Amino acid sequence: MPRSEADTIRILVSTDNHVGYAERHPVRKDDSWRTFDEIMQIAKKQDVDMVLLGGDLFHENKPSRKSMYQVMRSLRKHCLGMKPCELEFLSDAAEVFEGAFPFVNYEDPDINVAIPVFSIHGNHDDPSGDGHYCSLDLLQAAGLVNYFGRVPEADNIHVKPILLQKGRTKMALYGLSNVRDERMHRTFRDNKVRFYRPNQQKNDWFNLLALHQNHYAHTRTSYVAENMLPDFMDLVIWGHEHECLIDPVRNPETGFHVMQPGSSVATSLVPGEAVPKHVAILNITGRKFEVDKIPLKTVRPFVTREIVLASDKRFKGLDKQNNRHEITKRLMVIVNEMIEEANAEWRAVHAEDDDMDEDMEPPLPLVRLKVDYTAPDGARYEVENPHRFSNRFTGKVANHNDVVRFHCNTKGKKNVATAPGVREDIAEILESADTIKVDNLVQEFFAQQSLKILPQAPFSDAVNQFVSKDDKHAVEMFVIESLSTQVKELLQLDDDKIVDLDAHIQDFRQVMEKSFDAGQHKQAQRTKRFKRKPDGWDSDLDGHWINQPQALEDIPAEVEPKGNDRPTKRVPTSGVTFSDEDEDMDMDNQPVPIRAAPKRGAAAKTTAAAKKAAPGKKAAPAKKAAPAKKAAPAKKAPARGRKKKTPFVDSDEEEEEDYPEDDDEEEEEADEEEEDVIMEDDEEDPPAPPPKPKATSRVASTRASARATPVRATPARATQARLRLRRPPKPGLLARRLG
């Protein structure tokens, strides 16, 4: 197909931006967000159709307000505008996007999006905590990012594409967000990863996959091999690896190309980070693509070098006593050479800038010198303290605390992991012996003392979230959820059938363990979402769309595909299952189970306190005022009327029970405050109207609310039972009370 602008999809590709990295460093605090802003400027200047981010947009799971502000500022400044987006969205948005707004942002009539941004999450900004939200959920709710590639169940992954078309070019965009590498490797091995393909003209689609996993085998199972991915892919954008290998490389076994854009900011001073940083402009026309590399100019220059004193001619003859001063002097010369090299590289990158000032000074570079000071037999190299040596370059480098790294191979010490004859599995264990994992610590703890009520596997996961993701409420929410679930299960048992309560608790704990191991234990999901606003809706005349009852709809429960119900064309050996059947891309015809309305427990009973309460609001007795102080206003008690319907149903709110107030306690408080009561109203309260019957199912309640016309409730009249007035008493009344 000949290339033309009308048929070419232009995509800016970037991964691992790590906004917020070293934001408390006095020199490097603004490096990450400045480079991300440059990337968004490039997207606008190059007039691309979309931006694809491959994970780790933020460096932390809970980014700071500064980081979130800078990202939202860049996205709003460079990606919003009046330019129409030429990409035609062909997918069912409800299948690829989740959340309150299940549609692509550039089709939202309330937002003018010129350059849509599509992103998956990485291992640094992954979802966690109550509700299973991440920072990308906030950006999606703000209409700035299209968050796709979610993995609700790590042991049963379904990857559905975003179908886009421009002219005659069709693209299927697949997203696979980060999952712990060992678990992802096991899921691929067990053929539990299923990729869906378009059911029409599947040979006309350009298949693009973005994923965020280890690319290389750090250990036996802590990576995803390229041959595990489906061979119908045309290009794979590989995130998580920070070395910039922007040129696509073809895999001869699978036939697709792999591009590794790398990070846009150096987060570790290793040789892979010293490779010049780039972003790519991907031009797709039909089934062919081209890549244009664009260097990033706001990246801080970085130079690394490694020397061995025993083999370096500049340090010949210094392997003797009292040689520290001379070694330090010659090492300082090498570091100064590296600083000049870094500054020269920065000037070369900015040589073609028309707006660059000749007197402009380059930023302080990053310099890392690794020194092996292992001496021959009978000799010795004396080196200076690395921190003291690094501080000599304060004001010359950005990393003035860790410029040099000294290491020495101790005599007689051998690397057992790399010794010949050592089995591969034993070497793997020896290499990871110094790595302490939270999961291992929890398992060792439970091996000595077992749990009776709480399940062990979810407990270990909650502790891992607390330590790794800084989720301060992970353990608390786990305990509350586990105990409440077990209490509900025990209350459903018949009293005459309960023989051994401990046995029931043990059985249910094992059920929760198996559910978690099978990947069925998930966070509470949202059950309602907003419909798309009709084209003819006028907010000024008809009111805000989100305030209308018909704007809400139930989120259909996803039906798990069964292995025997959907035969596939073939079962690939790569550990991936994909399907070409028509029903695989059409999930709307599946039956949706109807959940019964939760019981309200004690709230369904009529109590004495409920009889006193008015239909609308209830006045609470005023607090007892301290002497010589002005009486405090009465505290407003919670309303006893019908609870206002919210857009989302929280599982905690569904199970919350309303308990009647204890009238005896109110009477006792009134007796204690008798000395402060001047006048009392003995008028009896009018009886409350009978309670309205409740809906028997959630579906019925939803349909009823959709048909009903919203009417503002009139404020209910409440009679105050006891009036505590602070006006001076009448002389006659006071005399009768004293008499």
From Swiss-Prot:
Cofactor: Mn(2+)
Protein name (record): Double-strand break repair protein mus-23
Family per similarity comment: Belongs to the MRE11/RAD32 family.
UniProt GO cellular component terms: chromosome, telomeric region; Mre11 complex; site of double-strand break
Listed GO biological process terms: double-strand break repair via homologous recombination; double-strand break repair via nonhomologous end joining; meiotic DNA double-strand break formation; mitochondrial double-strand break repair via homologous recombination; mitotic G2 DNA damage checkpoint signaling; mitotic intra-S DNA damage checkpoint signaling; telomere maintenance
Main location: nucleus
Biased composition (Basic residues): 523-532, 637-646
UniProt GO MF annotations: 3'-5'-DNA exonuclease activity; manganese ion binding; single-stranded DNA endodeoxyribonuclease activity
